[in-house]
Amino acid sequence: AQIEAEGYYPALFGKNALSISNSTINATSTGDIAIFTRGNLSIENSKVEANAPQDKKGIKARKTTTINQSWITTTGDESYDSINDSVLFNGNDGKVIGNVTVIGEETVSSEKTLIISEGTTLTIPDKAKFTNNGTVVVNGTIINNGQITCTNHSGGKATCIQKAVCELCNQEYGDLLEHNYSTKWMNNEEIHWQECTVCHNHKDE
């Protein structure tokens, strides 16, 4: 299902429980919590965006919250009892939890940062698209069988002979660095020189 919901409190409400599966939800509350249930909350294989006023939770359940294989964006600072193999954005700060597979298309917008920590994996499967317009920090694993587009590259290390390679999309970017000359002087019978530690270029005295 694809749902756009807006209300004062809450935008999306489950009296006894709330289950979201294989869905795209955009819920905005103008007065309080965006998505709320008095019982248990379950989110699976879904994309959920919850927008609430400042200092209010975006998503809340009075009992347990279980999230699996989903992409969650909330304006609140909440954490959840059980969240597995999902992406969680609290405001502009996002993280990959476990082993996440992108469903359809996902975009990191210009003001957001997504951290792929060591031991976690972000997979872009065949026909899926992942776009980075913000900042993606890759300390874990990227598996790309689909399409990655970066308007803002990150990671990699440039040298005097090799531009930096983006750790997300594997494309070169930026400029070459200046030579890194050794502090040690070398010489023969005619000249003295310093040598670049990378490409061995000579800088004569």
What would you call each of these model-derived segments?
Residues 150-205:
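Thrombospondin type-1
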Residues 7-15, 32-40, 55-63, 79-82, ...:
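Tandem-repeat/low-complexity and Cys-motif detector
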Residues 1-8, 19-31, 43-56, 71-82, ...:
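Beta-strand-rich solenoid/repeat architectures in extracellular/passenger domains
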Residues 65-68, 74, 90, 106, ...:
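Polar/charged side chains located within well-ordered beta-strands of beta-rich proteins
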Residues 67, 78-92:
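Long terminal segments
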Residues 1, 15, 21-23, 38, ...:
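Tandem-repeat architecture and repeat-register "anchor" residues
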Residues 87-103, 108:
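Extended, small-residue-rich solenoid/repeat segments and analogous flexible loops
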Residues 14, 134-138:
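Extracellular low-complexity Ser/Thr/Asn/Gly-rich intrinsically disordered segments
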